[in-house]
């Protein structure tokens, strides 16, 4: 790679100008003067002096005006903003030439430092008018100057013109509106009492003189002469009496007046005809601000635009005026070549026999070493032969029993025969065991009668009437009575129906359902996943079905906001699942005390997406129902398709359950699923609820 560099030779600085060779205008900078210097500058205002020589004063010598360059500034206040314009510059004339030819040279203005000699010069100029016969500020004619040996001409000291003051625009004076409230508050209420005497009905013993003593000083009483009526005017009477109704004024004290005004304001507040604008007409006292601290504001010299243009330093201005050929003659361009060395990327060595894992919750890392073992072919063949023979024997034996005993016999035989084990029971012994179990079961039913659960379920209070026939490989016959007695459910589900099925359990309720989880995973290869789900469900059967266990005793309880105890939890589950299975646990006491509670619960939960089941408060019944739900609605997921799951955390953060995420990634990748939602394909839309669709569409409409 080649880079071209442009080298510019620096021009030599002019020492006479102090290095400012490019500047062609005047340089003006700030000068700080004391009070005396400012006083002398005021007196030298409008003066023009030339190099002069005064006879009789040898000590003074000659004074050359070229050594001094003065400018007078009008003193202004710090808060006043003015624009100062520079007048004509002063011209120094030659003494020898009478033609008054002006000296032509460049004038450069720099800082002026006033020292002791300058102060002596200013004091001498002050006393100069006394030594001369004429004052300096008077204009002298050429004839007077010719007669005198000393020719006095004036230095032209430029003045900074002061611009006009900026007038402050006064604020608009608005008239204050007359306020009724203000007038009432400013005036005191006065009352007049006629000359009359009143007596109280109370006895003298109840009269308290303390009240009169406390209020005596607040009133000013005047003596009133009694009214007299004369029928005739006596001649000897010295006074003439005029009859008139007399009264005295009683002023209400201040505190009473305030109470009176507040009572009036209270009446006006609740008066519909009172205008609200009266409250805005009341005058408010202005707050007195503290005086600001006076700061020393330094005076700034303001220059005109023409003078500022001369001060602009543009070194390339002259170069642009020249041609390219003239520029490249004096300018050299150097070429430099360099190369970039690429960095070597180093990667960590990965072992082929290990798998690195990251725990998102605990924020820990770990690795697993993988190894593969070859199975023994002979053992697998023998096991498959034994299992096939065992299934054939059980199938032949079960065909000999009656159809009524088919359900119980097959369940008992299959549960007793554990996998990978032999049975040493003969056919005769097996038939004897079956008959004994049948007799024992009939006795138990005849003694106890119909159970409470079966009575409620048979009477129609157990759930919504729509019940599907299971399509699994269980021994349950769909043509039989669908009363769903607890005992019939217990014997209708086999362990084989739960094999390789996958469900999810809510991590927040693992401790509560610990016994149920242990019994489900004890004798079956059930794939159970824990998920910290935000809902109140206990188990998730598939991507659209969940199980929620509630207590019948708490159903009618009310919360602080007036809703039922389980109202919010059921509504939240309906927004996330297409089917919600609610298992209501009840006790025998509730059945006897409040039998109407069951149809109330059923009536409240009457919904096409809700299935309700009533069971006793025992874990065994709940386990049997869970086996039935797993065998009926749970699915088995393929591990090979699950390897394609990537970025599953995106859907989990949206509130999707883990089984729904698995269902989505079985048919789509993440990008394909988003495209299917945008196109609103029916297959993808059926998986989600309305709430899940809205959340997903909000995610797809985000912009970065």
UniProtKB/Swiss-Prot annotation:
Record field: transmembrane: none
UniProt GO molecular function: DNA secondary structure binding; nucleotide binding
Induction context: During meiosis.
Principal localisation: nucleus
Any single GO BP term: synaptonemal complex assembly
Record's keyword terms, sorted: Cell cycle, Chromosomal rearrangement, Chromosome, Chromosome partition, DNA-binding, Meiosis, Nucleotide-binding, Nucleus
Record's subcellular location: Nucleus; Chromosome
Any one cellular-component term (Gene Ontology): condensed nuclear chromosome
Family: Belongs to the ZIP2 family.
Subunit composition and interactions: Interacts with ZIP3.
Record function comment: Required for initiation of meiotic chromosome synapsis. Involved in synaptonemal complex formation, a structure that tethers a pair of homologous chromosomes along their lengths and plays a central role in recombination and homolog segregation during meiosis. Required for the normal localization of MSH4 to chromosomes.
Name used for this protein in its record: Protein ZIP2
Source species: Saccharomyces cerevisiae (strain ATCC 204508 / S288c) (Baker's yeast)
Encoding gene per record: ZIP2
């Amino acid at each position: 790679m080649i880079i071209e560099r442009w080298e510019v030779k620096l021009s030599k600085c002019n020492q006479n100008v102090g290095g400012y060779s490019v500047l062609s205008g005047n340089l003006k900078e700030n000068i700080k003067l004391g009070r005396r210097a400012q006083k002398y500058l005021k007196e030298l205002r409008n003066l023009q002096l030339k190099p002069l020589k005064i006879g009789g004063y040898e000590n003074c010598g000659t004074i050359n005006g070229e050594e001094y360059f003065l400018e007078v500034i009008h003193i202004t206040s710090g808060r006043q903003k003015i624009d100062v314009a520079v007048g004509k510059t002063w011209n120094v004339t030659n003494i020898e030439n009478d033609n008054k030819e002006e000296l032509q040279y460049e004038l450069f203005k720099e800082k002026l430092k006033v020292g002791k000699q300058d102060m002596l010069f200013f004091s001498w100029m002050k006393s100069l008018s006394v030594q001369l016969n004429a004052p300096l500020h008077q204009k002298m004619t050429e004839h007077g100057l010719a007669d005198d040996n000393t020719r006095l001409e004036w230095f032209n000291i430029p003045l900074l013109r002061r611009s006009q003051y900026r007038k402050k625009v006064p604020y608009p004076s608005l008239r204050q509106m007359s306020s009724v409230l203000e007038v009432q508050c400013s005036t005191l209420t006065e009352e007049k009492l006629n000359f009359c005497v009143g007596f109280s009905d109370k006895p003298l013993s109840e009269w308290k003189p303390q009240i009169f003593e406390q209020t005596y000083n607040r009133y000013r009483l005047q003596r009133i002469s009694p009214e007299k009526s004369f029928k005739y005017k006596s001649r000897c009477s010295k006074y003439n009496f005029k009859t008139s109704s007399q009264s005295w004024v009683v002023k209400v004290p201040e505190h009473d007046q305030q109470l009176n005004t507040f009572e009036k304001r209270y009446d006006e507040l609740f008066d519909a005809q009172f205008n609200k604008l009266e409250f805005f007409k009341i005058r408010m006292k202005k707050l007195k601000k503290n005086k600001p601290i006076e700061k020393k504001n330094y005076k700034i010299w303001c220059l005109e635009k023409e003078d500022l243009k001369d001060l602009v330093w543009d070194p390339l201005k002259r170069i642009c005026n020249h041609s390219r050929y003239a520029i490249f003659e004096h300018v050299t361009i150097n070429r430099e070549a360099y190369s970039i060395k690429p960095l070597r990327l180093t990667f960590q060595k990965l072992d082929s026999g290990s798998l690195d894992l990251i725990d998102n919750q605990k924020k820990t890392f770990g690795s697993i070493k993988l190894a593969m073992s070859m199975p023994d072919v002979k053992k697998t063949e023998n096991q498959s032969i034994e299992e096939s023979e065992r299934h054939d024997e059980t199938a032949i034996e079960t065909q000999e029993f009656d159809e009524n005993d088919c359900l119980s016999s097959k369940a008992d035989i299959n549960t007793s025969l554990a996998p990978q084990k032999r049975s040493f029971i003969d056919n005769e012994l097996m038939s004897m065991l079956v008959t004994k179990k049948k007799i024992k079961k009939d006795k138990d039913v005849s003694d106890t009668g119909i159970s409470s659960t079966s009575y409620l379920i048979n009477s129609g209070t157990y759930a919504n009437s729509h019940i599907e026939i299971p399509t699994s490989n269980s021994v349950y016959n769909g043509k039989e009575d669908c009363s769903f007695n607890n005992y019939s459910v217990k014997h209708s589900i086999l362990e084989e129906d739960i094999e390789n099925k996958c469900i999810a359990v809510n991590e927040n309720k693992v401790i509560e359902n610990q016994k149920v989880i242990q019994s489900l995973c004890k004798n079956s290869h059930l794939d159970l996943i824990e998920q910290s789900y935000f809902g109140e469900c206990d188990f998730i059967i598939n991507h659209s079905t969940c199980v929620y266990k509630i207590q019948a005793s708490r159903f009618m309880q009310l919360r602080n906001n007036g809703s039922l105890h389980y109202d919010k939890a059921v509504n939240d589950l309906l927004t996330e699942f297409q089917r919600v299975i609610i298992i209501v646990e009840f006790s025998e006491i509730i059945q006897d005390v409040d039998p109407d509670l069951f149809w109330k619960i059923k009536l409240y939960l009457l919904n096409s997406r809700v299935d309700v089941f009533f069971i006793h408060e025992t874990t065994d019944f709940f386990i049997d129902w869970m086996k039935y739900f797993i065998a009926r609605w749970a699915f088995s997921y393929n591990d090979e398709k699950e390897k394609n799951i990537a970025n599953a955390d995106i859907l989990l953060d949206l509130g999707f359950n883990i089984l729904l995420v698995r269902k989505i990634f079985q048919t789509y990748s993440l990008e394909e699923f988003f495209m299917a939602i945008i196109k609103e394909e029916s297959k993808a839309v059926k998986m989600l609820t309305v709430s899940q669709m809205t959340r997903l569409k909000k995610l797809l409409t985000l912009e970065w």
